[in-house]
Design a protein with these regions (language model features):
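Post-HExxH zinc-binding segment in Zn-dependent metallohydrolases
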Residues: 157, 162-204
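Long, amphipathic alpha-helical stalk/connector segments used for oligomerization, subunit docking
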Residues: 184-261
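Catalytic glutamate of the conserved HExxH
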Residues: 143, 147, 151, 155, ...
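C-terminal, non-catalytic "cap/extension" segments appended to globular domains
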Residues: 12, 16-25, 30-46, 51, ...
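Short pre-active-site segment immediately N-terminal to the catalytic Zn-binding motif
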Residues: 127-144, 159
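Active-site-proximal, well-structured secondary-structure segments within enzyme catalytic domains
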Residues: 2, 8-133
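Secondary-structure transition/capping motifs at alpha-helix termini
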Residues: 91-100, 151, 155-161, 181-192, ...
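Short glycine/serine- and small hydrophobic-enriched flexible loop segments
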Residues: 174-181, 185, 216-219, 278-285
Length: 325
């Protein structure tokens, strides 16, 4: 695959071109996008792109906090992390707090719910089992609760319908923010620590939002029967640079080369974090964020709700000018 996909001399600068005028990489990119458009598992996602596009643009407009120090103010061991998470959950829902502690120390047939790894891994939760590397820092403490919220909400029925879990990262991103604020209020971490956590999460969410907007634009081109060409892709990137915190041109090109080389789009996974970031920001401004968290949490562990219903809820509750209730 040509690594210099966008460093080119091309004749494809005409608006109306035929398939015969495309080079091999352009043909491949069009093929990748067409396969996603036609795939049954992707059609409900693509049908909701208008809503997802608006959410992406809102996430990109969120302001990153000011960081005064780039180091954490303290170390936090895993036992303290578990203790603080339990104390915090008690302020939201005692049943949830009890479930957290039961699962943390659950060890049935050597199958632990919380699995601490000794080497670096990207934290994840699989079939109700949480896997993290604990580094005794504040970020690890937040990550531990994030993955345990996934584990606590797991069910076999939900796993079976995992493709429809577009809100699956919403309770975890909400809980990250609420837990971080509680830690500041109880003088366990500093305001700068909170800002570091918020900046880390928002930066990742905005990166995913930029990439998802690019994927949506590629799908839109093909749905309009336009061939994806290098010129059109570069124009698309340049047109979106006015959006706050949109990725740089170089980052966009690097990402689209990844799509081309891997023959894969990533919007299905990315939109979970983007929606979570969007809802977390809205709930942060509400009168009772703890109640809002519980509503979202119980909604996401319901295996019978589909993506379309989730997005209707988002439109009704969180795309209003004012959710101060």
């Amino acid at each position: 695959m040509n690594k210099d996909f966008f460093n080119f001399e091309s004749n494809n600068f005409k608006e109306n071109i035929s398939k015969e005028q495309l080079d091999s990489d352009e043909i491949e990119m069009n093929k990748i996008i067409d396969e996603y458009i036609q795939h049954p598992d992707c059609q409900s996602y693509i049908a909701n792109f208008k809503t997802i596009k608006q959410i992406c643009e809102e996430v990109l407009k969120q302001r990153r906090p000011e960081i005064k120090e780039i180091e954490w103010s303290r170390n936090i061991g895993i036992n303290d992390a578990i203790k603080y998470a339990h104390q915090f959950l008690t302020t939201i829902d005692s049943t949830l707090a009890d479930q957290f502690m039961n699962l943390v120390y659950q060890n049935n047939n050597n199958q632990k719910t919380l699995n601490i790894q000794q080497k670096y891994i990207k934290p994840y939760c699989e079939k109700g089992k949480a896997y993290i590397e604990y580094r005794s820092d504040i970020k690890s403490m937040i990550t531990l609760l994030h993955e345990m919220i996934h584990a606590m909400g797991y069910s076999d029925a939900m796993h079976t319908n995992s493709e429809d879990r577009c809100l699956s990262e919403s309770p975890t991103l909400i809980i990250e923010n609420l837990f971080s604020k509680w830690l500041v209020e109880n003088k366990i971490i500093t305001q700068n620590d909170y800002n570091l956590l918020k900046e880390w999460r928002l930066r990742d969410s905005q990166d995913l939002a930029s990439k998802t907007l690019m994927e949506i634009a590629l799908v839109d081109m093909r749905k309009k029967d336009q061939y994806i060409t290098k010129k059109r892709v570069l124009e698309m990137i340049d047109e979106k640079q006015h959006i706050n915190n949109f990725a740089t041109r170089e980052e966009c090109i690097y990402y689209l080369m990844k799509v081309l080389n891997n023959k894969e789009l990533y919007f299905k996974e990315s939109e979970r974090y983007i929606i979570g970031q969007y809802i977390s920001d809205k709930i942060d401004k509400s009168r009772n964020p703890e109640k809002e968290f519980l509503e979202i949490y119980h909604l996401t562990i319901n295996p019978n709700i589909k993506s379309e219903e989730y997005l209707k809820i988002i439109k009704g509750k969180y795309q209003e000018p004012n959710i101060d209730r």
